Amino acid sequence: AHKIYGPKGIGLLYIRDGVTLTPLIFGGGQESGIRGGTENVPAIAGFGVAAKIAFNQMRSTMRHEIALRNYLIQRVLHEIPFCQLNGSHQNRLPGNANFSFEHVEGSSLLMMLDAQGICASSGSACASSSAEPSHVLTAIGLSDELAHASLRLTLGRNTTKKELDLVVSILKETIDQLRSISDSYLNRISR
């Protein structure tokens, strides 16, 4: 539910007719015998309210996220050299932008951004906790090096243009710092 601004720790599992699941937690038969334990009624109700709000605001949220995502992509691609957008420019989630920055290690970039209050992730959403390069990014043709140098930024319905301006400013400064100690970058620009 937290993905749609609802409470954390509650979700929904749709089970198609004919599919049998084995419970991980046995107990009193709650949740149709799929998971034992007391159901969190306030969280369930909160999820329901969040779903209703998300549905009612879906079109306006999408328009808002698409406009800001396109603004972010345009600024990053035009202001940070040796950068690329990963994936399609058009066919992508409204609030998602994934970039790769040559001559930058993704984990160092993440730590430095985090220290400045910027929440981001490296790789794809499917593999953000893995030390291996994202199989999604390598499947779309990125080298292991570029997959490791990727940064995923996501936007939401409350994101503002002013926040994105700050993110781009901090991102540029941080990448400049990291590249200033990168032998491959220094060799490339000295040619």
Where do the PLM segments sit?
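Conserved C-terminal alpha-helix-loop-beta "cap" of PLP-dependent enzymes
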Residues: 97-152
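A short linear hydrophobic-aromatic micro-motif
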Residues: 82-87, 120-124
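Active-site PLP attachment segment
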Residues: 1-49
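PLP-dependent enzyme catalytic core of the Aspartate aminotransferase-like
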Residues: 128, 132-191
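Structural signature of PLP-dependent enzymes
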Residues: 51-74, 84-93
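Solvent-exposed alpha-helices and their adjacent loops that cap or buttress functional pockets
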Residues: 4-7, 14, 23-25, 77-78, ...
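Hydrophobic C-terminal alpha-helix "anchor/cap" residues
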Residues: 76-77, 113
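A general structural signal for well-ordered alpha-helical segments in protein cores
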Residues: 7, 41-44, 51, 69, ...
